[in-house]
Amino acid sequence: MATPTSSPTPDLTRAAEVIDLARRVVGKGVRTLAAQGGPDVHQVLAYDLAHSAAAVETARSLIDYGGKGKSEALITCAFVADMLHEVSTRLLGREDMWGVEQNPLASAHDFMTAFREPEFLASLASVAGPRHLEDEFEMVQDTFRSFATKVIAPHAEHVHRHNADVPEEIISGLAELGAFGLSVPSEYGGFSEGGDGEYMANCIATEELSRASLGIGGSLITRPEILTRALVNGGTEAQKQEWLPKLASAEVMAAVAVTEPDYGSDVANLTTMAVKGTNEEGVEGYIINGVKTWCTFAARANVLMLLARTDPDRSKTHRGLSLFIVPKPLGDAHGFMFKQPGGGKMEGRPIDTIGYRGMHSYEIAIENWFVPADHLIGEESGLGKGFYYQMSGFENGRLQTAARAVGVMQASYESAIEYANNRKAFGHNIAEYQLTQAKLGRMAVITQASRQFSYTVAKLMGKGEGQMEASMVKAYVCKAAEWVSREAMQIHGGFGYAEEYSVSRLFVDARVLSIFEGADETLCLKVIARRLVEESAAK
């Protein structure tokens, strides 16, 4: 049983000092990494530094939040202590690798001790903390939570257990709410007026939909969002007029065809080719050949956003890639094969997965598939720019994935606290035991910290900034979701392993978060660590 105790007094000034200390230590590690050959040479060091830097930035984003009230300050101090513990754990025994002295974080140990006390964490078990959203975003949250609760949640378990399809009522309902037009500029039939509002609205909506179901909720708006960003950044005016209104209304649903069997996160070296040619009617365009994999929602989608090599010179790597909008018929979720009059063929094989079910993922073999020339994003001026257009969409995709992770965490926490308050063991509800309370407290703290960091990144991206932070929030929050969902399952005991409890679905769904939208290792080594080294050299 937990022993009642008074909480330590939150000290945000001291918390900021602790964050600054951790930041300086990580900075020394980055400079050492740069001096010794960089991320490709010292991958373990680079990975640890990337995750440490992401944890530090998560903590830094909480300082303003902590100043808004007592519970907010307690959550902030608890997370800063948790961050310090994570960085210390990665550093311990590797001080020489980092290029730092022994115990470089020792001056902050008193803070870590005070705010990692089991009694203190236990006191936070039911302190989720307010979100502090502006009125317009409160409305977004209420609207999407209501829809998710009434329409998505009732289908979540059936779709997961039977690997069923996304019900059409969910797609049509989201379309009526304008979910697919949140990032489409208003002049093209969407709701975006620019600024941080569109990123925040998307982030909040995605969390609420994912809280009900990752597979048939939060992920539905990600793929149209990625194509929308690519069109806004690189499309011709005619292409924007043609496609953006259809994406906003869900008349057109999109899937992303980038990854290949031998080229997962190594996008720059993919091999699918698009060669200029004509169809049987003499229309000019491109003929595509290659194999794409992990194309989620490809059967139900009307178009594929497909990245292909238009320059046969492989030495040009990412500079030889172009981005296409590839129309296709609707297909059967269990597999599909389409033929064009001129002989083109597209065949999709479903990939069975342990979780994240409903949208279904496919390996797609494409043979002599014709697309008109005006389906190349940017048309002639878009040749060789596909990688950049795609990445502009993926950056926001990483933020959305973090928001999806927050939704899964929130659902996991709610499931755990409800079960703990009703399950008795040894004569008491398990929620009364200190170990359970401490777990719930840490879950609440990490979930709110992850949410606030995602809000911070959304605001940065609304200003045209935050590309690095988008990768960091994805790296930190998705790993955190694995821990939160695991502990939620553990609190359920044996019932957590039973399909009749939703926490088992949340656990397997959470596992995909650090794999898709940029595998964690690739994100840390090729994006975060590399950028940290570049920034260090520029100082």
Predicted feature residues:
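FAD-binding core of flavoproteins
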Residues: 1-17, 27, 132-133, 196, ...
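N-terminal glycine-rich flavin-associated loop
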Residues: 217-238, 264
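Alpha-helical interface subdomain recognition
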Residues: 2-211, 222, 234, 239, ...
